[in-house]
């Protein structure tokens, strides 16, 4: 790479970083951190464990955001020094090191730039993920479980806290449905591009004749409700059913009727939770999910009105959005962005960052 090219490249990186820093507003983030640190130091912090958890989680996330931005700025500044050293010493090894670091910095800058695209009304929220098996019988149930593991591994690899609210197991293998929370800021904005129908094509391990099977699973991503959303639920409009929690194959995992199913009579929305130890805890978790679904319903109604005014058909999130092909070739492909990976095993193991980044950029383009 010529000296002039390097100079222009570094100027471009620095300019992009300045734009990112302006959008992130690091001074405001530092001020927010100071406020949260003061709240976290209060002796009464853990009097309300749920509020305390939110404060410490948000504090940790903001601190990581600032550290990440500061570290990336430092790497960009160090790059110019590294290239100068390579030029002055005419050292091929130093130049190779500098060019390798340049590639790595570009990638890190792209990832951070994606974060600045999460500017929607609910993008900064934590997320509720609901996965359900659709057409395809036992293969669909197995596929739904693979998707659950994929998202949980993705979160685990990044140190994000998750909480499984409910998992309904299928009789032979896999799951009928599951609901879990990803408890980190911007989880909703990041994961919302995953909403839609996912398709799996493979030789079915459940078919004695070894035939190719196509199965489907639906993914729904909801923002966690906050008090400012004013989602109020009248208890008289709820039907509450309690039952015994069950595990794989229908086996009971609890000797008491601690699982809770809520039916919101005006809308017909049904949610359930069985993973907590007590009926009270399960009902509270189920209420959180119900509130999120009601918020999403309200949001969709408002969007439909806006689309009608604009003459726009709106986003068809319910349509098929990604295919996972294991036979006759191996490929995972997003049907909206055309982003694809030839290693399905890695994808199912949580390596979905490329799909998320491509989806977020695609969504931003659709909004223009």
Curated annotation (Swiss-Prot):
InterPro entries membership: PCRF (IPR005139), Pep_chain_release_fac_I (IPR000352), Pep_chain_release_fac_I_sf (IPR045853), PrfB (IPR004374)
PTM-bearing positions, type N5-methylglutamine: 251
Keywords associated with the record: Cytoplasm, Methylation, Protein biosynthesis
Molecular-function GO terms, alphabetical: translation release factor activity, codon specific
Subcellular location: Cytoplasm
PROSITE patterns in the record: RF_PROK_I
Gene3D superfamilies noted in UniProt: 3.30.160.20, 3.30.70.1660, Release factor
One Pfam family named in its UniProt record: RF-1
Top-level taxon of the source organism: Bacteria
Main location: cytoplasm
The keyword Cytoplasm appears for this protein: yes
The keyword Iron appears for this protein: no
Post-translational modification: Methylated by PrmC. Methylation increases the termination efficiency of RF2.
GO cellular component: cytoplasm
Transmembrane annotation, as ranges: none
Family (UniProt): Belongs to the prokaryotic/mitochondrial release factor family.
Function: Peptide chain release factor 2 directs the termination of translation in response to the peptide chain termination codons UGA and UAA.
Descriptive protein name: Peptide chain release factor 2
Lineage per the UniProt record: Bacteria, Bacillati, Actinomycetota, Actinomycetes, Kitasatosporales
Gene from which the chain derives: prfB
């Amino acid at each position: 790479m010529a000296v002039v090219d390097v100079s222009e490249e570094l100027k471009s990186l620095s300019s992009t970083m300045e734009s990112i820093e302006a959008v992130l507003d690091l001074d405001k983030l530092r001020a927010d951190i100071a406020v949260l640190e003061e709240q976290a130091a209060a002796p009464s912090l853990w009097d309300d464990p749920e509020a305390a958890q939110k404060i410490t989680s948000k504090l940790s996330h903001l601190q990581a955001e600032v550290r990440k931005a500061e570290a990336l700025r430092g790497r960009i500044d160090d790059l110019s020094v590294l290239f100068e050293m390579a030029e002055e010493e005419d050292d091929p090894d130093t130049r190779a090191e500098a060019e390798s670091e340049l590639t790595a910095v570009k990638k890190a800058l792209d990832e951070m730039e994606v974060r600045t695209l999460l500017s929607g009304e609910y993008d900064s929220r934590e997320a509720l993920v609901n996965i359900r098996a659709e057409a395809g019988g036992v293969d669909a149930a197995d596929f739904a479980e693979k998707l659950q593991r994929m998202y949980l591994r993705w979160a685990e690899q990044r140190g994000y806290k998750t909480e499984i609210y409910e998992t309904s197991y299928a009789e032979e293998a896999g799951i009928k449905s599951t609901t879990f929370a990803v408890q980190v800021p911007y989880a909703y904005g990041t994961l919302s591009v995953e909403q839609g129908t996912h398709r799996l094509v493979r030789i079915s391990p459940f078919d004695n004749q070894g035939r190719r099977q196509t199965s489907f699973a639906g993914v729904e991503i909801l923002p966690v409700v906050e008090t400012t959303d004013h989602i109020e639920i009248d208890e008289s409009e709820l039907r509450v059913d309690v039952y015994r929690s069950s595990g794989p194959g229908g086996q009971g995992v609890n000797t008491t009727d601690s699982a809770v199913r809520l039916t919101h009579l005006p809308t017909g929305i049904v949610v359930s939770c069985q993973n907590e130890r007590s009926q009270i805890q399960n009902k509270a978790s189920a209420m959180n999910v119900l509130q999120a679904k009601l918020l999403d319903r309200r949001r969709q109604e408002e969007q439909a009105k806006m689309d009608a005014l604009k003459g726009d058909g709106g986003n068809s999130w319910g349509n098929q959005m990604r295919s996972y092909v294991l036979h006759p070739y191996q490929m995972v492909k997003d049907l909206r962005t055309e982003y694809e990976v030839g290693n399905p095993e890695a994808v199912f193991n949580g390596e979905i960052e490329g799909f998320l980044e491509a989806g977020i950029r695609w969504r931003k383009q659709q909004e223009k």
